[in-house]
């Protein structure tokens, strides 16, 4: 994926690159807050549906209880594979604050989203098995503020759908050369 065209800072172009980057993922890193105030990092299968973004996790997973207890205090991250990155220092990444709401298993929404999940990943036996497992739950993620980083000098804040160039309190005296 070539992100060099992002340099023009055109918001529509950047938005398209963010969508393209995000669409390449079937799982997402999750940071969640437990009842005891400790943060847990993990990952979960991601279902990018016409209905939004969903995760499907077991109630045995540590982050399940965290999401139930603190559904409005979640962070998710899409991170470029280290093997595909030009350098481990500048891995492309996309991070969002998120909230989660549990989807009832026997609802039309659950069935529609899971049908999309099966269609995308194929009707592998494992997918059919986890669909039937009663300890798994589906959560819809509502993404809010975030940041996309595509390299040095290519960091963008996302706030209510508005994308702006990220700046810091102590910017470099010498901008990154592209």
Where are these regions (language model features)?
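C-terminal edge-of-domain segments
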Residues: 2-11, 112-120, 124-178
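Hydrophobic residues embedded in beta-strands of well-ordered beta-sheets
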Residues: 53-54, 74, 146
């Amino acid at each position: 994926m070539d992100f060099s065209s992002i340099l023009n800072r055109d918001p529509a172009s950047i938005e398209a690159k963010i969508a393209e980057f995000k669409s390449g993922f079937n799982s997402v890193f999750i940071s969640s807050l437990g009842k005891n105030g400790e943060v847990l990092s993990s990952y979960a299968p991601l279902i990018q549906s016409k209905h939004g973004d969903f995760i499907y996790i077991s109630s045995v997973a540590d982050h399940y209880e965290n999401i139930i207890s603190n559904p409005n205090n979640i962070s998710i991250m899409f991170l470029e594979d280290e093997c595909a990155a030009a350098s481990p220092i500048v891995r492309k990444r996309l991070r969002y604050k998120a909230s989660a709401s549990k989807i009832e298993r026997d609802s039309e929404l659950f069935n529609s989203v899971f049908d999309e999940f099966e269609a995308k990943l194929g009707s592998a036996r494992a997918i059919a098995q986890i669909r039937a497992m009663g300890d798994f739950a589906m959560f819809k993620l509502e993404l809010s503020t975030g940041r996309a980083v595509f390299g040095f000098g290519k960091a963008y804040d996302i706030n209510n759908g508005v994308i702006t160039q990220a700046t810091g309190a102590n910017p470099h005296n010498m901008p990154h050369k592209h």
